[in-house]
Amino acid sequence: MLPSIVTPFIAAMLASWVALLLHELAHSAAAELVGVRIWGMRLGMGPTIWKGSFNGRELHIGAFPFLGAVQLLDEDAGAIGYRDIVSGRWRFEWGPDAWRAPIISAAGGVSNLFGMVLFLVTWELGGEPGMGSFMGQLLLFGIVTNFSGYLNLLPWSKSDGGHLLAHLYAAKLLRPVRAMS
């Protein structure tokens, strides 16, 4: 029998993987919807524990279920405004097809709304987090999805929040504010 802390930890890790997969699939579906091709997807960080192909695209799975990315084809990424992709750094310039980029960036957050609804419904129905019941598993999944979704909206460069901020700035819908001295 596993120690009592191991089972909830494994459950939380599995919930994290599922939440991350749904989040990245939402980005992928949005890219396809607006006509932007992708060549691969990365799920998780750390050393790659599995590499293969899925639906004709490369798929890399990292050891830890945190952070993910949908990799756009370079020419499509350039067409919608991303620059300096080859160097590993990026910046965003607004252009005629740039309206597609915020849609792709926002799609992951929309998938996290599913987790929020799931959490609220399960909580109202009396679920308690854990592996003991189906309701507990749903509640745990909702908690993990909400937590990862909120972190992803923070405006750091590799997050969806950071990408959305860059899109708003490039579209001149957002201006930097200078502190008064």
Regions inferred by a protein language model and the residue ranges of each:
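Hydrophobic transmembrane alpha-helices and their immediate loop junctions
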Residues: 1-181
